[in-house]
Swiss-Prot record:
Belongs to the RecA family. The gene is recA. InterPro entries: AAA+_ATPase, DNA_recomb/repair_RecA, DNA_recomb/repair_RecA_CS, P-loop_NTPase, RecA-like_C, RecA-like_N, RecA_ATP-bd, RecA_C_sf. It comes from Gluconacetobacter polyoxogenes (Acetobacter polyoxogenes). It is found in: Cytoplasm. This is Protein RecA.
């Protein structure tokens, strides 16, 4: 390729990259093949596959994270798993339940210590975000979940009449709050998770008509954005016992994005660890699949996925060995998870 005389392209590129990182922060630009070098403090998502897909072993602390998807796709379940993992490490967690829909019994089944979980059920969006700001600035909270952005209704809308027009109020509220929160989140090393819903844009001819609520501010301020979808049902005979779930990392400032992982969310149990071990084991070549049979180190572990899952539940030592070997081959597994930015739906 023709090159302008007197210009060292590699030096010019390095200069441009360092200038971008100085202006916009570390991780704002990187080569797709680069492995993250900085040691980031993380909290597990409760899913081994998703921890690998995120590239740093979990969700980063001191950052804003957005989890979005359709109704009943597993957004709250994922957030509760992150809370449970943080509490296991001795962390303090808070849940701002703007939807007024948190089920303490379900949270307890996922491993959340509900007795020590801070919970707030605010009346208006301003109140919810003020509470979030106060908790973040205290520096004493490790994980703070806001469920959900769509339920952060501005006070003016609550006090007005039905049918009144309040164009842009919600987006303005989110934009203002995030400008305040982003610095505090970084300084206090708090993980701030926003759960968000999906809306359909009218009159979209090309591309995805789906959009998240609350304007564009959260898209910019979030270091990690994850799209979660229910892709099928898990049945035991005729009874539905769980959902097959797909999560795609659509934005990641900590490692290369566009990785996708699938796992099972079982009713009353949450993310199925043994189901993931089988899927990831097959990806890493640790578990062999021949027809309907699954085997590991020449030992058959079950005919059909559900039987193989039960075998690993009954043999925790084999499950632990598969998990150790999957973690050792995390790079291979992560490469197998890579998809294009527009595969299975465009960015929202």
């Amino acid at each position: 390729m023709a090159q302008a005389p007197g210009i060292d392209k590699s030096k010019a590129l390095e200069g441009a990259l360092s200038q971008i990182e100085r202006a916009f922060g570390k991780g704002s630009i990187m080569r797709m093949g680069e492995r993250p070098t900085e040691q980031v403090d993380v909290i597990s998502t409760g899913s081994l596959g998703l921890d690998i897909a995120l590239g740093i072993g979990g969700l980063p602390r001191g950052r804003i994270i957005e989890i979005y998807g359709p109704e009943s796709s597993g957004k709250t379940t994922m957030a509760l798993h992150a809370i449970a993992e943080a509490q296991r490490k001795g962390g303090t967690c808070a849940f701002i339940d703007a939807e007024h829909a948190l089920d303490p019994g379900y949270a307890r089944k996922l491993g959340v210590d509900v007795d020590n979980l801070l919970i707030s059920q605010p009346d208006a969006g301003e109140q919810a975000l003020e509470i979030a700001d106060t908790l973040v600035r205290s520096g004493a909270v490790d994980v703070l979940v806001v469920d959900s952005v769509a339920a952060l209704v501005p006070r003016a809308e609550l006090e007005g009449d039905m049918g009144d027009s309040h164009v842009g109020l919600h987006a303005r509220l989110m934009s203002q709050a995030l400008r305040k929160l982003t610095g505090s989140v970084s300084r206090s090393n708090t993980m701030l998770i926003f759960l968000n819903q999906i809306r359909l844009k009218i009159g979209v001819m090309f591309g995805s008509p789906e959009s998240t609520t609350g304007g564009n501010a959260l898209k910019f301020y979030a270091s990690v954005r994850m799209d979660i979808r229910r892709i099928g049902s898990i049945k035991d005979k005729d009874e539905v016992t769980g959902n097959q779930t797909r999560v795609k990392v659509v934005k990641n400032k900590m490692a290369p994005p566009f990785r996708q992982v699938e796992f099972d969310i079982m009713y009353g149990e949450g993310i199925s660890k043994v189901g993931e071990l089988i899927d990831l084991g097959v990806k890493a070549g640790i578990v062999e699949k021949s027809g309907a049979w699954f085997s590991c180190d020449s030992q058959r572990i079950g005919q059909g996925r559900e039987n193989a899952k039960q075998f690993l539940r009954d043999h925790p030592e084999m499950a632990a060995d598969i998990e150790r070997r999957v973690r050792e081959q995390a790079g291979v597994v992560a490469e197998a998870m890579l998809v294009g930015p527009d595969e299975d739906g465009a960015e929202h």
